[in-house]
């Protein structure tokens, strides 16, 4: 899979949902649902409410994303 056309934005975790999903408020004040990427799962990185994260979005569905990096 190529990363062409992917949109990367920063956001803040608002709530944790079940199944490794989170509600994230992006820097442009849009709230999306984001899943945790595979590498974050493998290395067991904890993501909590209030953390700043980097989210990757597909241009086809801007309401769902993938958390690819935890900033703090």
Swiss-Prot record:
**What's the protein here called?**
Translation initiation factor IF-1
Location of the protein in the cell: Cytoplasm
Keywords assigned by UniProt?
A: Cytoplasm, Initiation factor, Protein biosynthesis, RNA-binding, rRNA-binding
A single GO CC term for this protein reads: cytosol
Pfam short name (any one): eIF-1a
The reply to whether Aminoacyl-tRNA synthetase figures as a keyword in the UniProt entry is no
Q: Which residues form the S1-like domain?
A: 1-72
Q: Which organism is it from?
A: Malacoplasma penetrans (strain HF-2)
Record family assignment = Belongs to the IF-1 family.
Gene that encodes it: infA
MF term (GO), any: ribosome binding
What the entry lists under Gene3D superfamilies is as follows:
Nucleic acid-binding proteins
What does the subunit section of this Swiss-Prot or TrEMBL entry state?
Answer: Component of the 30S ribosomal translation pre-initiation complex which assembles on the 30S ribosome in the order IF-2 and IF-3, IF-1 and N-formylmethionyl-tRNA(fMet); mRNA recruitment can occur at any time during PIC assembly.
User: CDD domains from the xrefs?
Assistant: S1_IF1 (cd04451)
| Signal peptide feature range | none
Coiled-coil-forming residues are: none
Under the heading NCBIfam families, the entry gives: infA (TIGR00008)
| Role played | One of the essential components for the initiation of protein synthesis. Stabilizes the binding of IF-2 and IF-3 on the 30S subunit to which N-formylmethionyl-tRNA(fMet) subsequently binds. Helps modulate mRNA selection, yielding the 30S pre-initiation complex (PIC). Upon addition of the 50S ribosomal subunit IF-1, IF-2 and IF-3 are released leaving the mature 70S translation initiation complex.
